[in-house]
Amino acid sequence: MSQDMLSRAEKNASKASITNVKFVLSPITKIPLESESADCIISNCVINLLGQDEKPVCFKEVHRLLKPGGRLAVSDILAKKEFTEELKRDMGLYVGCISGASLVGEYENWLKGAGFEGL
């Protein structure tokens, strides 16, 4: 998220009189919010843009932020088999949220490793 996107989100929330939301500009792997402070965290085509080593860190951070019984809603593209190095480096596929796709099993392991249940 950029500062411009953050400003737009705040403006839209204000226009809609939404007051129970907080927008924070920070690295996704180290969010400056208190533990167990979020009821729901939504990610749309973001986590797959992280490097492979950052993805499990991201899920641990999200789990830390969620209140007991909180929900994580993720929309990401997952792969059934490993992409070739050429496909991983393809900028068009990266921008289209494809080249950063993780394997289904990896994703499930990262979520479980972070403490998520009921996948």
What residue ranges belong to the model's regions?
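A short acidic, Gly/Pro-enriched loop at the edge of an enzyme's catalytic core
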Residues: T29-I41
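Class I S-adenosylmethionine-dependent transferase superfamily signal
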Residues: C45, E61-V62, L111
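Class I SAM-dependent methyltransferase SAM/SAH-binding core
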Residues: M1-I31, V57
